[in-house]
C-alpha cells in the first residue's frame, strides 16, 4: 500500500515538474516581442497624424508581425475589429447556406457575392493593418490589397442593393446603366486610393485623402441610391416594413463611419492620448462593421421576402452581374499590381 502511495506521489511530482515547464514552453513558442516605439523612430511612411506612440519596429521577421496580433500597439484594435467581423460573416455565410442553394439558384448569386465581398474587404483590411509595418514595400503592397477589397465590396454592395432592395420606379430610371457605372466607380476607387498612396510623398496629406474620398463618395452615392429611394418611398407611403429600418440604420452607420475616416477625431484634439484606443480610424472600423452586418441582415431578409418581385424584375441578369463582378475584381487587382511595381521601382531607385 505504501509503495502504491509513493508511486502516486512520484507521478504527482513529475506532473508538477511538467507544469512548471509550461511557462518556459509558452515563452519559447511566443517569444517576448520587441517593445513598440515612438513616431520619431519609424520612417515617415508609417506615421499617422496625432498618433505619437505604439508603432511596431520595421524590418522584423514575418513571424514577429503575425505575433503582434496579440500585442498592444496602435493597430491592434484596427486588426481585431475587422478580423472578428470577417469571422462573423463566415458564420452567417454558413448559416445562410443551410437554406440557400448558392450554386444552383441564380437569384441567390448576388447574395453570395455580397457575402464574399464583405469577407474579402474585412480580411484584406485586417492583413493590411497587421502586416504593413514590415517595410515600405510591404506597407504599399498590403494597403493596395486593402483597396482591392474595398473595390470588390463596393461592387458587391451595389449589385445586392440593385438586385434585392430596389423599387420598380428607380429600376426603370437606372436599368442598363447602374451596374456598369458601379463597376467603373469601384475600379476608380481602387485606382484613386492606390495612386494617392503612391504619390503621397509629393502630395499634401489632404490631397492624398481626396484621392481616396472623392471616388469612394461618388461610388457610394450610386451604390446606395436604390436603398435611399426605397427608404424615401416607404416614408412617403407611411409603410411599416421592418427591413427598411435595417436599411436606414446601415446608411446611418456608414455615414458616421465616413465622418471618422475623413476627420482625425478625437486624436487631433488629444494628440498622444488615443494612440492605443479611441482613434478615429478605430471608430471608423467599428461603425463600418456594424454597417456591414446590418446591411447583410437587411439583404438576407429582402432575398427571402421579395423573391417574386425581383425574379420578375431581373430575369436572368444574375449571370451577367457575376461576370461583371469578376471583371471588376480582376481589373482592380491588376491596377494594384501595376502601381505596386511602380512603387517597387521607385524604392529601388531611392535605395541606389
Swiss-Prot record:
Tissues showing expression: Strongly expressed in ovary and brain; lower expression in testis and pituitary. Not detected in heart, kidney, spleen, intestine, gill and muscle.
Membrane-crossing segments per the record: 76-96, 111-131, 140-160, 176-196, 243-263, 276-296, 317-337
Predominant place of localization: membrane
Record's keyword annotation contains Transmembrane helix: yes
Topology within the bilayer: Multi-pass membrane protein
Keywords of the record: Cell membrane, Developmental protein, Differentiation, Lipid-binding, Membrane, Oogenesis, Receptor, Steroid-binding, Transmembrane, Transmembrane helix
Induction data: By progestin in ovarian tissues and human chorionic gonadotropin (hCG) in oocytes undergoing meiotic maturation.
GO biological processes: oogenesis
Cytoplasmic side: 1-75, 132-139, 197-242, 297-316
Extracellular domain ranges by topology: 97-110, 161-175, 264-275, 338-352
One Gene Ontology term of the molecular function aspect: nuclear steroid receptor activity
The keyword Cell membrane is annotated on this UniProt entry: yes
InterPro entries: AdipoR/HlyIII-related (IPR004254)
Disulfide partners: none
Record's function text: Steroid membrane receptor. Binds progesterone, progestin and 17-hydroxyprogesterone in vitro. Capable of mediating progestin-induced oocyte maturation.
Family (UniProt): Belongs to the ADIPOR family.
UniProt protein name: Membrane progestin receptor alpha
Amino acid at each position: 500500500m505504501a509503495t502504491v502511495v509513493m508511486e502516486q506521489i512520484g507521478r504527482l511530482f513529475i506532473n508538477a515538474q511538467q507544469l512548471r515547464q509550461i511557462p518556459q514552453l509558452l515563452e519559447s513558442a511566443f517569444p517576448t516581442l520587441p517593445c513598440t516605439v515612438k513616431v520619431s523612430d519609424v520612417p515617415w511612411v508609417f506615421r499617422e497624424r496625432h498618433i505619437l506612440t505604439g508603432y511596431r519596429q520595421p524590418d522584423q521577421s514575418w513571424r514577429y508581425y503575425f505575433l503582434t496580433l496579440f500585442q498592444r500597439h496602435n493597430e491592434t484594435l484596427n486588426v481585431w475589429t475587422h478580423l472578428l467581423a470577417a469571422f462573423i460573416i463566415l458564420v452567417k455565410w454558413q448559416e445562410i447556406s443551410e437554406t440557400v442553394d448558392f450554386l444552383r439558384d441564380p437569384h441567390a448569386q448576388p447574395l453570395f457575392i455580397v457575402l464574399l465581398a464583405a469577407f474579402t474587404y474585412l480580411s484584406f483590411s485586417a492583413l493590411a493593418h497587421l502586416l504593413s509595418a514590415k517595410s515600405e514595400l510591404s506597407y504599399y503592397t498590403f494597403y493596395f490589397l486593402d483597396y482591392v477589397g474595398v473595390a470588390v465590396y463596393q461592387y458587391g454592395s451595389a449589385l445586392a442593393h440593385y438586385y434585392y432592395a430596389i423599387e420598380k420606379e428607380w429600376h426603370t430610371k437606372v436599368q442598363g446603366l447602374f451596374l456598369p457605372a458601379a463597376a467603373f466607380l469601384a475600379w476608380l476607387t481602387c485606382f484613386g486610393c492606390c495612386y494617392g498612396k503612391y504619390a503621397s510623398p509629393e502630395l499634401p496629406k489632404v490631397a492624398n485623402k481626396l484621392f481616396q474620398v472623392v471616388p469612394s463618395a461618388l461610388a457610394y452615392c450610386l451604390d446606395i441610391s436604390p436603398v435611399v429611394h426605397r427608404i424615401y418611398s416607404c416614408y412617403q407611403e407611411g409603410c411599416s416594413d421592418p427591413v427598411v429600418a435595417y436599411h436606414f440604420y446601415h446608411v446611418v452607420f456608414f455615414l458616421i463611419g465616413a465622418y471618422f475616416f475623413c476627420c482625425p477625431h478625437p486624436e487631433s484634439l488629444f494628440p498622444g492620448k488615443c494612440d492605443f484606443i479611441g482613434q478615429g480610424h478605430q471608430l471608423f472600423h467599428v461603425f463600418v462593421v456594424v454597417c456591414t452586418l446590418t446591411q447583410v441582415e437587411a439583404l438576407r431578409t429582402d432575398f427571402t421576402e421579395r423573391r417574386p418581385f425581383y425574379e420578375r424584375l431581373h430575369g436572368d441578369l444574375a449571370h451577367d452581374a457575376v461576370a461583371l463582378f469578376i471583371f471588376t475584381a480582376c481589373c482592380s487587382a491588376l491596377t494594384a499590381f501595376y502601381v505596386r511595381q511602380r512603387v517597387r521601382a521607385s524604392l529601388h531607385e531611392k535605395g541606389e
